[in-house]
Design a protein with these regions (language model features):
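Glycine-enriched alpha-helix->loop->beta-strand junction motifs that scaffold or abut catalytic
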Residues: 47-51, 122-124
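Binuclear metal-dependent phosphoesterase catalytic core
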Residues: 2-3, 17, 70-74, 100-103, ...
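Active-site environment of divalent metal-dependent phosphoester hydrolases
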Residues: 10-14, 36-40, 58-63, 86-91, ...
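Active-site neighborhood of phospho(di)ester-bond hydrolases with catalytic His/Asp-centered motifs
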Residues: 5-7, 28-34, 52-57, 79-82, ...
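Mid-chain, well-packed structural core segment of small domains
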Residues: 74-109
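Helix-adjacent hinge/juxtasegments
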Residues: 50-88
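N-terminal active-site segment of His-dependent metallophosphoesterases
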Residues: 1-49, 59-61, 66, 141-152
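Short secondary-structure boundary/capping segments
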Residues: 43, 61, 68-71, 99, ...
Length: 153
C-alpha cells in the first residue's frame, strides 16, 4: 500500500498537483490540513483513491472535515491530524499518546511546515512538511512493514 501524505498547501495547488502526478499509483491520499479543501480542485487526480482530509488551524471556517482520521492501511492503523490540537510545535508527547490510544503504528501530522520522521517505540511519527514549498512524503505499508520517503519537488 502506497500512501501520499501532504499538508499545509494554504491555497497553493501547483506543487500539490505535481505530487499527485508523481504518485499516481498511491492507493491513499492524505491531506493533513491548512488547505485540505485544495484537493477538491484536483479531484480528477484523486479519482479511485481513498482520500482522507483533516482540518488544520487555518481551515476552521473553510472546511467541514474532521480534526483527525484513523484508518487502516494494509493491516496497520494510521492516525492522521494537523497537529495543532496536540501542540506539536512544543513536542510530541501529546500526539504520541493520542496515536497510541488507537494502537496506531503510523502517526501523520503537519502544522510545523518542517519535514520530520522518527520511530518512537514502534510508532512512526511523520510530518511531510509544507506542500506549498514542495515538501511531501510517501509511506509504504506492506505485510506489516512500514517505510517512508520524505520528498521535495
Amino acid at each position: 500500500m502506497k500512501i501520499l501524505v501532504v499538508s499545509d498547501s494554504h491555497g497553493s495547488t501547483a506543487f500539490l498537483e505535481q505530487a499527485l502526478s508523481r504518485t499516481r499509483d498511491a492507493g491513499i491520499v492524505v491531506h493533513l490540513g491548512d488547505g485540505a479543501d485544495d484537493l477538491e480542485a484536483l479531484r480528477e487526480l484523486t479519482g479511485g483513491k481513498l482520500v482522507y482530509q483533516c482540518n488544520g488551524n487555518m481551515d476552521l471556517y473553510r472546511c467541514n472535515y474532521t480534526d483527525r482520521c484513523i484508518f487502516p492501511a494494509d493491516g496497520v492503523t494510521v492516525f492522521a491530524c494537523h497537529g495543532h490540537l496536540y501542540d506539536v510545535k512544543s513536542g510530541f508527547l501529546r500526539i504520541t499518546l493520542a496515536a497510541k490510544e488507537f494502537n496506531s503504528r503510523i502517526c501523520l501530522f503537519g502544522h510545523t511546515h518542517s519535514q520530520f520522521a522518527e520511530d518512537r517505540d514502534g510508532l512512526l511519527l511523520l510530518n511531510p512538511g509544507s506542500i506549498r514549498r514542495g515538501d511531501y512524503a510517501v509511506v509504504y505499508v506492506e505485510n506489516g512493514n512500514v517505510r517512508y520517503e520524505l520528498k521535495n519537488i
